[in-house]
Amino acid sequence: MAIPQSCTVLVAGGGPGGSYTAAALAREGVDVVLLEADCHPRYHIGESLLPSMRYLLRFIDLEDTFEQHGFQKKLGAFFKLNAKSAGYTDFIRANGPNGYSWNVVRSESDEILFRHATKSGAKTFENVSLKSVNFEPYENDKFTSQDKLTNPGRPVSAEWKTKDGCSGTISFDYLVDATGRVGILSTKYLKNRKFNESFRNIAMWGYFKGNIPPSPGTDRENQPISEGMRDGSGWVWMLPLHNGTVSIGAVVRKDIFQAKKKALPEGTTEAQTLASLVALCPTISSYLEPAELASGIRQAADYSYSANAYAGPNFRIVGDAGCFIDPFFSSGHHLALSSALAAATSINACIRGDCNEFDASRWFAKKVDEGYTLFLVVVMAALKQIRMQEQPILSDLDEEGFDRAFTILRPVIQGAADKETAPKAKGESITETIDLCLTALNDLHDTELQRKLTSIVEAKGTPEQEQLLGKLSPDETAALHRMRAMHSILPMGELEDFENSNIDGFKARLEKGSLGLRRERALCRDHAGDLQM
């Protein structure tokens, strides 16, 4: 099949985010073209999934396919931050006997998603790269960074090129950038990618066979573990896969990694370098004593980044194309697929006439930004504990481990609220998570800041409130915005949680055949985190 000259929605990138977006829209009868630069199956890292994947896959009728494929069941996960005992997040206890997720071989799981987009009705093409995008002026001054939007014009066509040298142009009504870290819109046109200096890391990994399974002889046997290095320089993952191997990888700050490599004897191999990093994690090292390396060693930059805009007139940016977080809590797939569902929802809302383009793109951009912000603050708190090994960041001095902390963090790091949690308690649960992390990051330890925020809350709805807001420093204003973003989120669990999220008076309508947005009364809450500024 030849690449058509036009379509309603062009999706660039056939990874999880792009394939999911294409499948969700095609199931609504939308004319979708999906271009993938490589050919499936192709290798990719990022093999651990959260329980929220089940609900996302179920919406496009793909849950059973993943279930039947034979991927390694992920019943929970261990997190060992320092010398104290590991914390464990139990998916089964929280979500029931079928509440587990999977560790996946990405070449297999990504291909399943891509082929499903084809079966759903999308026109899919492999070995085709998006080379450039053409824009037309779009006269609307509402698209501002305050709403995580921008207006470079409306994209109307793009040039593509195949690996064998063929090229052409395709026109479209909407564009979805799912090009991963390439992020063609953010890096080439918007130029708005911003790296988090705290997370300029290097990742090094390989695959082993013959290891001792984690927590042998228990109901938690062979579940993944992430362990902080004893010198605080990074962390190591151990992730069992269904093909009989275990994925072992180290994530280290770039400057420290370079110093460690320089200090190693001349002639040190990549495998020996990885072994020297794993040796800083006693628990994982003990499980690997009888294991043998079964692959080459891979290395990549593991820089966390975000942007000041994730959407604009008739375009959406999903997954890693827009933002990326250190993978300590396996957030990648969750953020990719939840943003993909949000992209499909907002685009189809415009096609159906549920709302205008500005409202749809603003809803999408805020949805993406809020999910990213919540995971970011949780990861930052955990990594701060790793880097400050003996300081009581996520536990009290007299606590033996981190079970209390990980019970509080569970709604975020499982990507879902517990099934047994009542709707009202979900908000309390996420607030407790945020409070723990903000305390760990010292964001609210400043009593002067607390006093100012309290004054703003008490003055809500009065002229004095505007005066108080005007007296905040840039850092204090940023803290207030962070609170506003985080306190407005419920964790993404079952699809009704996604639907019930009210953003600027719009909620998602997740019904096959009528996917889109429905207008609701805008929320008005009573704490400083939700003040409209």
Curated annotation (Swiss-Prot):
Q: Which GO terms describe its molecular function?
A: FAD binding; flavin-dependent halogenase activity; monooxygenase activity
- Which InterPro entries does the UniProt record give? FAD-bd, FAD/NAD-bd_sf, Flavin-dep_Halogenase_NPB
Listed pathway(s)? Secondary metabolite biosynthesis; terpenoid biosynthesis
A Gene Ontology biological process in which this protein takes part is: terpenoid biosynthetic process
Identify the residues that bind FAD. G14, G17, E47
Q: Which reaction does it catalyse?
A: griseophenone C + FADH2 + chloride + O2 = griseophenone B + FAD + 2 H2O + H(+)
Keyword Lyase annotated: no
Q: If you read the UniProt record, what top EC class would you report for this enzyme, in one word?
A: oxidoreductase
Query: Disulfide pairs?
Result: none
What are the protein's UniProt keywords?
FAD, Flavoprotein, Monooxygenase, Oxidoreductase
Listed binding positions for chloride are: S331, G332
Per the record's keyword annotation, is Flavoprotein included, yes or no? yes
Q: How is it used?
A: Griseofulvin is a spirocyclic fungal natural product used in treatment of fungal dermatophytes.
User: What are the EC numbers?
Assistant: 1.14.14.-
State the function annotated in the UniProt record.
Answer: Flavin-dependent halogenase; part of the gene cluster that mediates the biosynthesis of griseofulvin, an important antifungal drug that has been in use for a long time for treating dermatophyte infections. The first step of the pathway is the formation of the heptaketide backbone by gsfA which is initiated by priming with acetyl-CoA, followed by sequential condensations of 6 malonyl-CoA units. The resulting benzophenone can undergo a spontaneous dehydration to form norlichexanthone.
Protein family: Belongs to the flavin-dependent halogenase family.
Name-wise, this protein is Flavin-dependent halogenase gsfI
Q: Which organism is this protein's natural source?
A: Penicillium aethiopicum
